[in-house]
Amino acid sequence: MKYEGWPDEGELVVGKVDDIEDFGVFVDLEQYQDKRGLVHVSEVASGWIKNVRDHVNEDQTVVAKVLGVDESAQQIDLSLKDVNDHQHSDTIQEWKNEQKADKWLTLAFGEDMADDQFRRIANGLLADFGSLYDGFEQAAIHGHEALADTALEDDEIDAIVETARDNVSVPYVTVTGYVSLQSPDGDGVDTIKDALQAAEGNGEVPDEVDLDVTYVGAPEYRLRVQAPNYKTAESALEAAGDRAVDSVTAHDGSGAFHRERQLDDDA
């Protein structure tokens, strides 16, 4: 997806070197529709430049900083020397991520997706998440909940979530829930302790799952699960809550699993 309009001053943009002259370098902007910028020779690199071609090549992909935009003159002034290695690496990675997300949109809605639908969905994700990639990543981690406040239709959300979970690589996801546990009998402390051990799985939690149980204030305990994907994390979280509740109720206590704290969380 290429943006319509113009880049902002100070923005880092990805471009391809189109033409090299003695006075500077013309760069076609990869993220903007039909936009071209000029890197004056003084902005190609620090120090005296004898030959511009010693620093850039035609068709080279570069990251440039936007120094100024004159829409009336159709002119964009760029700098290569003002971009450090870290900025270059991050900007290229973000650009590649957006290219991936473009393909995911096509996977979600098909090759024959109408241009106006593509723009509407893409603009919706950009408005809420800042980038298409971040929208898909949040959909992969949090599912439908991540897109609930967007202007997308239900069937569009379904398609994005399904595609995200099939294609987005998330190093790990973290989900959190709470259990309220109470036991009125004389052995209540031991009953609660047994319930917490049950929540932790008694050594039966899969190796790919990291489960942590912490006390946050009577009668609530926090369950925090880290796992390689959303489905695994959610399954492990719900199973931990069920184990704790089943254990305490089996000893005439009471328990409940819930997503949010029932009291103010100062922990």
UniProtKB/Swiss-Prot annotation:
SMART domains: S1
CDD domains, A to Z: S1_IF2_alpha (cd04452)
Domain S1 motif: 10-81
A GO MF label: ribosome binding
Sorted UniProt keywords: Initiation factor, Protein biosynthesis, RNA-binding
Residue ranges of the TM segments: none
GO terms of biological process kind: translational initiation
Pfam families (UniProt xref): EIF_2_alpha (PF07541), S1 (PF00575)
Entry superkingdom: Archaea
InterPro entries with a match to the protein in the record: NA-bd_OB-fold, S1_domain, S1_IF2_alpha, TIF2_asu_arc, TIF2_asu_C, TIF2_asu_middle_sf, TIF_2_asu
Entry keyword annotation includes RNA-binding: yes
Record's function text: eIF-2 functions in the early steps of protein synthesis by forming a ternary complex with GTP and initiator tRNA.
Subunit text: Heterotrimer composed of an alpha, a beta and a gamma chain.
Family as reported in the entry's similarity comment: Belongs to the eIF-2-alpha family.
NCBIfam families: PRK03987.1-4, PRK03987.1-5
HAMAP family referenced in this protein's UniProt entry, alphabetically: eIF_2_alpha
Protein name: Translation initiation factor 2 subunit alpha
Organism in which the protein naturally occurs: Halobacterium salinarum (strain ATCC 700922 / JCM 11081 / NRC-1) (Halobacterium halobium)
Gene assigned in the entry: eif2a
